[in-house]
Amino acid sequence: ISEFAGDSGVDTVLSRRWTALDPTAELQAILAINRATNWEEFEKGLEDFHAPAQNFVFASLDGTIAYKANGKIPIYEDGTDALLPLPGWEKQYEWKGFIPFDELPKVINPEKGFIATANNRVVDESYPYHISNVWAQPYRYERIYEVLVENDSLTLDDMKALQMDAVNLRAREF
C-alpha cells in the first residue's frame, strides 16, 4: 500500500497485516455451524471461523441460548493501540499471538433469559485482552434490551417489529 503514502521524502514503506488475509477455513466453519444440533457442536464449528471477527448467537430446540464473540484477534504488547498504522519494523508492534479460542467472550444461558447484541462493547475493563477500539454506540443494544426486559413472551411478529423499531434512545436524552 506504499503507493498511497505520498512523497514524504522518507524512505519508509507501508504494509498491512490483517487476519482475513491469512488462509482460513470459514467454509468448513459454516458447514459445521449449519449442521450443529447443540451448543457444543456449534462452538466447535466456530474454531475454524477466523476472519473477520463476528458476533455469533445460537438457540436450540432444547432451549439453550448462547453468544460468542469469535475470530482470530491479535494480541499486542501491553498498551499498544492498533487503531492507526504502527511502525511494523519495530519488534514491540509484532503480534504476540491470538486471543485463545476458549478465552473469547461468550455467554451461555444467561440468568435474564435472553441475549442482546448490536456490535456494542461486550467486555469490561477486567477482560485481559484488547478486542477493539471501535464499538457501536450503546443505544441500539439498550433499545433491544429494553424491549426484551419489558416483555415476558414475544411472538415472531414482535421480533419482526423489533427489527424495524425506530425508537431512538439517544433522542430521548435531549
Where are the regions a protein language model picked out?
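Mature extracytoplasmic enzyme cores
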Residues: I1-F174
